[in-house]
C-alpha cells in the first residue's frame, strides 16, 4: 500500500529548470527549504512561471497547507546549487527534489512555519519518500547541502525542530502505508 499523494495544484514554470527527463531511480534526495519572504505558494509559483529567475523549486507549501508544483519532478529545479562549495558529498540539484515551505514572521522578526504548512509538508515529503524509495537520512535541509541558512526556522532552532520534522515524516509514512502482512492459508483438518 502506498502513501496517498496530497492534492497538488500545478503552475509549471516555462523557464526556471533544466529539462533533464530524470528517471525515478536518479532521484535520491529531498531538500527542504524556506521561502524567505511572506508570499504564499501560488504567488511563488507565479513568480517563477515565465520570467528567468535563476532559481526554482519543484514544490511550494503554503500558509494554509496548499501545495503548488512549479517544476516537473523528472526535471531539475535550481534549488540547492552553489558556486561550487558543497557541504554534502552527493546531493545536488540533479539528483534531488526541492520543496520550499512558505513562512511568516513573528513579532520578533523570526521566520516560522504555520501548523498547516508543517502538516502539509509532512504529507508531501512522506509521499515523495514512498514514491522514490528515499529513506529519512536522504531528507536534507538546504543548509545540510551547502551551509546556506535555509530552512532558517529549522537551522535557527537547532536540531530539535528538524529532528521532529524527520520523525513526523517517517511516522506519517508508516501510518499512511502500513506494511502488508500475509495471512496464512487455513489448513485442512487431518
Please give the residue ranges for each predicted region.
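Basic/polar, cationic surfaces and motifs that engage anionic cell-wall
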Residues: 2-12, 19-24, 94, 102-190
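N-terminal catalytic cores of peptidoglycan-degrading enzymes
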Residues: 1-92
